[in-house]
């Protein structure tokens, strides 16, 4: 169990006047417990939950298929198991709420996640419970990482960055996007990642597309190649993107990359505690705008247990940065026929900003032979 996170959650419940909070989404279950129930993210009816009470008791709830995993990872926990296909998911959960003495209580639940039919069944089974939305509570807590989380993200960011470097070093003109995909996934696991998400391999004219996977297209001289992947470790994600050029870059590619490096350095200077997310984006646009290409609506976003989290550094919304935030920052050009992107993982420190994905030197485009 993640004691630091439980303590943060208890303080948040006291401020919100909640008697308990239920972490039911895969990301928030992992936030409380420190581990992912393996099949929950892909078979989302296989409910798992961590119930945290205001007096810091924690009880777990999981489907029978995952009982051995949960019991092995939390052998001392109060764990309730429900049987898949027997229709008893919510009755078992309601019994857990009763046994914790929470009837008549105000309980926070992720109303954005739990299916409406299941929440309605809970309301019928334990009608004297007041169910309150808790998604925003978790979002606010997860924005500020603990020192342990920051170090975890540092490890994962280096794994991901290093895997991309390994992959580019293994290919040359004539290699295919599939070759590059195989190389980066192999390197991720070899370096210690447990999984990956959203693998983007886009070369030549396909580099203009934001989120495409690999094809059998062969790399050609002059191609720009965008390679982005989110390495995963203990439920946390680190998204890194590097752009390579095959053998010889164009003058325009070099011009854009020189601007990206200046944007990178500017962001490293202005990302700091107390800074406004909107002001950061506007300062970024002053430099990026010299290129003459249309920007996307943000240059950065929170990252951690989900691929995109708050805060966003963009034209919508307003956040004040705080130490402990971990962000993905990404100048990107997606133009007609080509694209370039430079994405790093950074953390807001007490003094300013620190890059966590620091394996690759990014002053120049990666060269592929």
Task: Show where each model-derived region lies.
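Active-site neighborhoods and metal-handling regions in enzymes and metal-associated proteins
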Residues: 1-369
